[in-house]
């Protein structure tokens, strides 16, 4: 039986990104209640500009390890991802809808029955990510299939696909009636960015070269910020700048993380959050909203305090539930990781 060694640096990156997701959900919930100053609004915008693209890049980074060695057929691979991603998507969506429906008197935006029925083609709120990720994998599998038959010896497939979907992102994103096509148009490029990062890091044996890549990313991004003020009124430039920011920050996070991995050990708790990120991703919205409601009813309206309590409190609650209940209960763990439980039974 072949065993694989987990990449602790990837777990660390995912752990950092989950914390950004929780912080992003905390700030997003406050935007409708308070007037953000420029600093807080800027923080929220920066978080939302890169944290989900970077998550998708992680999937591309890991996917590239198996490209060219796909022993399964395309339909078998898609079926496996449907079981591993779509099944949790449906189960979590139903549970989340039931919770929101039960608490409809306490929340600002109660859910309707139509939102539950439309899960197959219109995700509920933050669960768009799982829906989009499955479609992104499907496109990647189909692209592999086409290249394997038409251009089996072409060595720049990832570069070509990245450029292709970068163009699609600028020209087609938001123009489709079906939201799934918009997810593909807007985020497939980040998947292939992750594939390219894997390719680059494999070629950069010297860790100082990796650090120089990170420094270069920061310098390029800084020069772009200088130009933004003069060109921000141009919609095309705004889109270009947003995607460029996401790409640069993603490269920076990967480069710095892999550079640091050669000199220090990452915190175990952060690696744990990254390794089992699904429960934290799925649960944090509920607890962020719950803490916000409790603080409001207690008369605590200070925005900074709301942010701190929402972020720290929801992270702590998710961690406690994960340690005490989720990882010890096979049925609950199945909701988040169905394939893992199937393998355990075997």
Task: Label each PLM-derived region with a short phrase.
Residues 120, 143-237:
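Aromatic-enriched alpha-helical transmembrane segments of multi-pass intramembrane proteins
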Residues 184, 204-271, 286, 301:
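Alpha-helical transmembrane segments and terminal signal-anchor/GPI-anchor hydrophobic tails
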Residues 275-289:
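Hydrophobic alpha-helical membrane segments
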Residues 1-166, 264, 272, 297-346:
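Membrane-cytosol interface segments of multi-pass membrane proteins
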Residues 29-34, 102, 106, 170-177, ...:
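Juxtamembrane "helix-exit" motif on the non-cytosolic side of transmembrane helices
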Residues 40-52, 117-132, 172-190, 224-252:
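Interfacial loop-to-helix transition and helix-capping segments at the boundaries
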Residues 58-76, 178-184, 240-248, 257, ...:
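Cytoplasmic juxtamembrane interface segments
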Residues 59-63, 135, 139-143, 189-201, ...:
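Transmembrane alpha-helical segments
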